[in-house]
Amino acid sequence: MSDERYQSRYGRYDSGRGGRSGYYSNYQNSSHHRSNDGPNTNTHGPSNGNGNSGGYYHGYYNRHGSMNGRAASSGRGYYGGHNTHITSAPHNNPNAYSRAPATGNTSYTGSYYSRGGNSSGRGGYSSYNRGGYHASHQYNNGGYYHRNNNYNSSYTERQKSVSGDSATSGGMKYTSSHRTTHVTHPAHPPITIQRSGSNGNGVAQGNASSGEVPTAPRRETTAQNNGRDKREEQLKKYGISNMAQGYLEIMDQNSSSTTSVTQTEIELDEKLREMNSQVFRTMCELALVENQYTRDTLNVQLTQEKLDTLLLS
């Protein structure tokens, strides 16, 4: 392959550029991480690390399967701008991930860039502690897994050894730890319950220590008293002393009232029918009178014509 070039998703294979052969890669961040003064072009080969390349990382895979290069940007949000050794592998070579990555502020596993303000961490997260959370990303035989290495959260419950009553000596304490933060929460103070006095409704209660029986509180309310007084007034109004008898008598009175109303309705219906009949008779009489009037008018006209005929003859 003298001058053959292959383009793939991992970069471009170029065997005729400057005597180097291997995979070239150009890692480009999203548009909101690129600087305005950097180039927006695909530059092959490692960068010198001195210019503002606008958020690119330029590197290449050598023949031995590792990526060597230099960060093109020294600002935050990318690799630290120092000489960086990336432990990665060329295409279709999963065995290259078996070598453990180097440690230090400039050693990264994989091609993930740091998003934090300090690029001295490992993997995709920087050493900047966002709420006490760190993550380490490593390759495992061509795969990718996630490991939480610096996050610790525990919640323990300890029984405090005390002598005497535990309610008066503090009882149980709860401890929680999150990284270096250690907080001890004291137990709640004991609650004392009084068993003598008033129940809140003005009714005196008995003393449990002396064996007195507490007085049962009254459950009557003002609305209940008003309703009962109203019923008693109604019964007195009708002269009724027994509740059941009062209900029966009230029902009888209501029935009598209903019967009276029904009878009155029947009588009114009969009177209405009589009035309708009388109106109909009156209308018929008026029709007869009108017919008689028409007949009399015709008779008068006929008589007048006869008189005119006699006078002309």
UniProtKB/Swiss-Prot annotation:
Composition bias, Basic and acidic residues: 1-17, 217-233
Pfam family, one: Lge1
Keyword Acyltransferase: no
Compositional bias annotation for Polar residues: 84-96, 161-178, 193-212
Comp. bias (Low complexity): 38-50, 144-155
Gene Ontology CC annotation, any one: nucleus
Chain residue ranges for the region called Disordered: 1-56, 83-102, 144-233
Subcellular locations according to the entry: Nucleus
BP GO annotations: chromatin organization
Protein keywords: Activator, Chromatin regulator, Coiled coil, Nucleus, Transcription, Transcription regulation
UniProt-listed InterPro entries: Tscrpt_reg_Lge1
CDD domains: Lge1
Function comment: Involved in transcriptional activation. Also required for ubiquitination of histone H2B to form H2BK123ub1. H2BK123ub1 gives a specific tag for epigenetic transcriptional activation, telomeric silencing, and is also a prerequisite for H3K4me and H3K79me formation. Its precise role in H2BK123ub1 formation however is unclear.
Protein name: Transcriptional regulatory protein LGE1
Organism: Candida glabrata (strain ATCC 2001 / BCRC 20586 / JCM 3761 / NBRC 0622 / NRRL Y-65 / CBS 138) (Yeast)
